Swiss-Prot record:
CDD domains noted in UniProt: RRM_RNPS1 (cd12365)
Annotated keywords: Cytoplasm, mRNA processing, mRNA splicing, Nucleus, RNA-binding
Protein family: Belongs to the splicing factor SR family.
Organism: Xenopus laevis (African clawed frog)
Comp. bias regions, Low complexity: 45-103
Gene Ontology MF terms: RNA binding
UniProt-recorded name of the protein: RNA-binding protein with serine-rich domain 1-B
Residue ranges constituting the RRM domain according to the UniProt record: 161-240
Stretches with biased composition (Basic residues): 104-120, 128-140, 244-276
Length: 283
């Protein structure tokens, strides 16, 4: 038998309910999943806020500690930067001085070099003078001679030691035929002068012991260049109002007036004398 329409409706309703029931758990599952996601998001948000607050507090504490440490580190960094800058400036100055010296230093260096160059020839001259041996003497001084000894006697005695170039025997002013007691003998070779010194120093001439000594030749004197002084400038005459007239003119123009000498009058004495004479005559 064919089912009735009412049964058909019931069956269709049941099927729809079953389908709805089947769909409901899927929806519930999706709703549950959505709720879980929302709860997770809320938890994550709450945990994020708490962590942010914690991080803020920690960041504030760390910032305070960081500021203190930053100040100390800043001071140390500033000190280090200063030291670094000073060291860098020193290194730069040293490098600049080693690389390219300043113009003032160049001038000082040039002056020192010029001074050292100018001093070198003087040193060379001194060293040459020290190194160069002194010339050997050829002149002999003979002292403590008696007045009886003449040039001929000295020539006869000292010619035995070599060729004599010159004999200088000063004479006394007041007694021209007598010597002053000493003489100079100049030989041609220094060896001859040394031989005469060896034999005649402490020897005897005319019964008296004499002395013989070498005369050192002086160094040739260099003629110093004369420095001509500039001519003196004549001072201009003083102005008229400053000129004072000479004293002679003053005296001639205004001679001194001598006050007349006061003389005592002799008239009262005469009167007295007359009065006395008259009194005597009356008596």
């Amino acid at each position: 038998m064919a089912p009735s329409p009412s049964k058909r409706k019931e069956r269709s309703e049941d099927k729809a309910k079953e389908r709805g029931k089947e769909k409901a758990p899927g929806k519930e599952a999706t709703d549950k999943d959505r709720g879980r996601d929302k709860a997770k998001k809320r938890r994550s948000a709450s945990s994020g806020s708490s962590s942010s607050s914690r991080s803020r507090s920690s960041s504030s504490s760390s910032s305070s500690s960081g500021s203190s440490s930053g100040s100390s580190s800043g001071s140390s960094s500033s000190a280090s930067s200063r030291s670094g800058s000073s060291s860098s400036s020193r290194s730069s100055s040293s490098s600049s001085s080693s690389g390219s010296p300043s113009p003032s230093r160049r001038r000082h260096d040039n002056r020192r070099r010029s001074r050292s160059k100018s001093k070198q020839p003087k040193r060379d001259e001194k060293e040459r003078k020290r190194r160069s041996p002194s010339p050997r003497p050829t002149k002999v001084h003979i002292g403590r001679l008696t007045r009886n000894v003449t040039k001929d006697h000295i020539l006869e005695i000292f010619s035995t030691y070599g060729k004599i170039k010159m004999i200088d025997m000063p004479v006394d002013r007041y007694h021209p035929h007598l010597s002053k007691g000493y003489a100079y003998v100049e030989f041609e070779a220094p060896e001859e002068a040394e031989k005469a010194l060896k034999h005649m120093d402490g020897g005897q001439i005319d019964g008296q012991e004499i002395t013989a000594s070498a005369v050192l030749t002086p160094w040739p004197m260099r003629a110093m260049p004369r420095r001509f002084s500039p001519p003196r400038r004549m001072l201009p005459p003083p102005p008229m109002w400053r000129r004072s007239p000479p004293r002679m003119r003053r005296r001639s123009r205004s001679p001194r007036r001598r006050s007349p000498v006061r003389r005592r009058s002799r008239s009262p004495a005469r009167r007295r004398h007359r009065s006395r004479s008259s009194s005597n005559s009356s008596r």
